[in-house]
Design a protein with these regions (language model features):
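Short beta-strand elements in bilobed, periplasmic/extracellular small-molecule ligand-binding domains
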Residues: 3-15, 98-101, 113-137, 142-143
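Short beta-strand/turn micro-motifs composed of small residues
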Residues: 37-39, 59-61, 74, 99-104, ...
Length: 226
């Protein structure tokens, strides 16, 4: 919204495919005044990024790699995730078990799993990490953390089939806020960065060219599901 209609913007999707990502970058070098790039991986950087003038490049979201010479607006999938869970400690203590659902095919950084386990050990909570909901039922007394929206919906569907009430019989936390989470049941508790702020800062970089290096905090939106 902060960019006028005078700006020409090309939007490319790499679907987290490294070969496609590299091909897009290779064909884009020298064609644009600014490059706003979400990397294909959180820990591995493409050599083609080094071919872009660092003053023209902004890295978004993923960033667990050496990016000292680049502008970036990233999120922390480890310590910030732990800190967000700590904000919910009073609620999480009401559950006998915490379950993180992270699908095998998900591109979400796996360091979240490490900090999930660390939080549960530090707070003496039973925990489990699962990759599929196919043969899994939702049980009373458990709290679930789901990364993808499709998995949040599946957990809600399974709970309704079992006659369980979200926020009463079991807990549910989603990752990355969407408008839908405000209206599902009595609202889904969310851990998320401020995407609007990320967009505003990105527009500022495009407009001013002023270098920026910031890691946005993971915020908690507490709703009726926990």
């Amino acid at each position: 919204r902060r960019l006028s209609t005078r700006y020409k913007v090309d939007l490319w999707f790499h679907q987290y495919n490294e070969a496609l990502f590299n091909a897009i970058l290779r064909d884009s070098i020298g064609r644009y005044n600014k490059y706003v790039v979400m990397n294909f991986d959180n820990e591995k950087i493409s050599p083609y990024l080094y071919k872009i003038d660092s003053s023209r490049l902004l890295l978004l979201d993923f960033g667990q790699f050496d990016k000292r010479e680049y502008s970036y607006i990233c999120q922390d999938f480890g310590e910030a995730f732990y800190a967000a869970m700590a904000q919910l400690s009073d609620r999480l203590q009401n559950y006998r078990k915490l379950i993180l659902f992270l699908a095998r095919e998900s591109k979400h950084p796996k360091e979240t799993c490490d900090y999930f386990r660390k939080y549960c050990v530090d707070h003496q909570l039973e925990c489990e990490i699962i990759e599929t909901l196919d043969d899994r039922e939702v049980h009373s007394g458990e709290a679930y953390i789901a990364i993808r929206q499709v998995d949040v919906v599946e957990i809600v569907k399974k709970s309704r089939a079992a006659g369980l009430t979200c926020g009463v019989d079991f807990g549910l936390i989603a990752y990355n806020d969407t408008p839908a989470y405000e209206v599902i049941d009595k609202g889904i508790t969310v851990m998320s960065v401020d995407w609007q702020k990320m967009g505003i800062l990105t527009a500022d970089f495009i407009l001013s060219g002023k270098p920026i290096q910031v890691c946005l905090p993971t915020e908690v939106n507490l709703r009726g599901s926990l």
